[in-house]
């Protein structure tokens, strides 16, 4: 059992820890890949639902790389859904990709889920996703991953 083997089973113990360290649950987010979530059982789904009820974020990563369908979204209590790079690589020129992304964005938003597109590298991709109503964008268009020390030097020090 994934929940028990990872020591995550007692959500309420986690709630006590959060209170002890005096942080807002909204500062915490669990991320699980689409494939892992699809393979997990009811206990894991219930675990994530309890986290969301506590105010903790739950994000599905790499949506579109597995075998789930949009219909599965109604079974999971998510706060964020990350559209996989593979679904938006040619979104600015591929009508099929555009329609798929639009369906994912529309359904997710109808369920109150924030939508993030991963792997955005071109302005045209960003513009198309913005037009479709995507909430957030991630990717090399804005910068490559950097070590914490470099991030601090570039963005936090004046």
Regions found by a protein language model. Name each.
Residues 1-12:
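Single conserved hydrophobic/aromatic residue that forms the stacking wall/gate
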Residues 6, 20, 27-42, 54-158:
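EAL-family c-di-GMP phosphodiesterase catalytic domain
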Residues 10, 43-44:
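Short glycine/threonine-rich loop-to-helix capping motif typified by GTGT followed
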Residues 13-17, 46-54:
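Catalytic-core regions built around general acid/base machinery
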């Amino acid at each position: 059992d994934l929940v028990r083997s990872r020591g995550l089973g007692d959500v309420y113990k986690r709630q006590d820890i959060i209170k002890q360290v005096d942080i807002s649950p909204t500062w915490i987010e669990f991320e699980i890949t689409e494939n892992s979530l699809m393979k997990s059982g009811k206990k894991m789904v219930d675990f994530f639902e309890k986290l969301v009820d506590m105010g903790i974020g739950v994000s599905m990563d790499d949506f579109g790389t597995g075998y789930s369908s949009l219909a599965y979204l109604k079974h999971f209590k998510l706060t964020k859904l990350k559209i996989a790079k593979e679904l938006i690589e040619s979104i600015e020129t591929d009508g099929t990709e555009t329609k798929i992304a639009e369906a994912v964005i529309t359904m997710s938003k109808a369920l109150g889920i924030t939508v993030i597109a991963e792997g955005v590298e071109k302005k045209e991709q960003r513009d198309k996703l913005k037009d479709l109503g995507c909430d957030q964008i991630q990717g090399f268009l804005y910068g490559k991953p950097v070590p914490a020390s470099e991030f601090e030097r570039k963005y936090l020090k004046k």
